Design a protein with these regions (language model features):
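Conserved PLP-enzyme active-site core in the AAT-like
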Residues: 1-158, 163
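PLP-dependent enzyme catalytic core of the Aspartate aminotransferase-like
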Residues: 2-5, 23, 195, 202, ...
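Short, solvent-exposed polar/charged micro-motifs at secondary-structure junctions
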Residues: 17-19, 171-176, 219-224
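Short, flexible turn/loop "capping" segments at secondary-structure junctions
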Residues: 89-90, 122, 179-181, 238-243
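A common structural junction motif
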Residues: 116-117, 204-214, 265-269
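Short, well-ordered beta-strand elements within core beta-sheets of diverse protein domains
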Residues: 128-137, 184-192, 247-251
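Conserved small-domain helix->loop->beta segment predominantly found in fold-type I
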Residues: 147-211, 233-237
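Positively charged, small/polar-rich N-terminal and surface patches that mediate targeting and assembly
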Residues: 161, 214, 220-221
Length: 269
């Protein structure tokens, strides 16, 4: 027990953030787009609320990647990113990064890093450096493939709902368009009630069943029994993560191959 307390709120609602602020609040922590429903938080608004209460704004930027979204330019004080995902991009490294434009915070973080020893090995560092050379190329392709698939799936008869910030008319679209260069390679799809998610994901050939994301290969998983299985079902359902939800990490493969694979998987249901 480190003595840290927190209040969980929907950060997409700036009024909810404001209402949750207390005298001892030191940080507003958010993830945008969120996992697994791809909800988008207005970073500028969230940071403004935090700063009005002398707190810092910390953004997990993993789903977006720094190519698509630069939270420091939007008022955030600290940005976190999993280097295992888009920064590494090849599913062959485990790493994480903390970035800040505040020199005082940077010195404090560096002191913790030196004291605890949580630094990357030379091999992990090499793999991430290698991957950064192709970050723009990869993320552009992730963006293109994901938007095309989301648009197609949005009209599919066996899909109840598509969660992707790049779809016009969705609640997150205008904010995402304003603060993101591209909408990213992550999406979630909700099958029609009664359809078997296990059968669907196991029928796929190009999409691989795995919990990770952000690599060049397309991955797919079922949050209810994989990434979010430890969350009690009633809490999971309260937060919109239904049994029929499938999370998709769209890779850089040929778009027609990806579409054909999803189509044959859905046709088999």
């Amino acid at each position: 027990d480190l003595g840290v307390t927190y209040t969980a709120v929907d950060t997409a609602d700036s009024a909810a953030i404001e209402a949750a602020m207390q005298d001892n609040t030191k940080m507003v922590y958010l993830e945008t787009p969120s996992n697994p429903l791809l909800h988008v938080t207005d970073i500028e608004q969230a940071a403004s609320v935090a700063h009005a209460h002398d707190a810092i704004a910390v953004v997990d930027n993993t789903f977006a990647s720094p190519y698509n979204q630069t939270p420091l330019d939007l008022g955030a004080d600290v940005v976190l990113a999993s280097g295992t995902k888009y920064l590494g991009g090849h599913s062959d490294t485990v790493s994480g990064f903390v970035v800040t434009s505040d020199e005082t915070l940077a010195d404090q973080i560096k002191m913790i890093q030196l004291s605890v020893g949580a630094v990357l090995s030379p091999q992990e560092s090499f793999l991430v450096q290698r991957s950064l050379k192709t970050l723009a190329l990869r993320v552009e392709r992730h963006n293109e493939n994901a938007l095309a698939l989301a648009t197609w799936l949005n009209d599919h008869e066996k899909i109840q709902k598509v969660y992707y910030p790049g779809l016009p008319g969705t609640p997150d679209y205008e904010i995402a368009k304003r603060q993101m260069r591209g909408f990213g390679g992550m999406m979630s799809i909700e099958l029609q009630e009664g359809l078997d998610t296990k059968q669907f994901v196991e029928n796929l050939n190009v999409f691989q069943l795995a919990e990770s994301l952000g690599g060049v290969e397309s991955l797919i998983e079922v949050p209810a029994v994989m990434t979010h299985a430890s969350i009690p079902r009633e809490i999971r359902l309260e937060n919109g993560i239904k049994d029929e939800l499938v999370r998709v990490s769209v890779g850089v493969e040929n778009l027609a191959d990806l579409k054909d694979d999803l189509a044959q998987g859905l046709d088999a249901l």
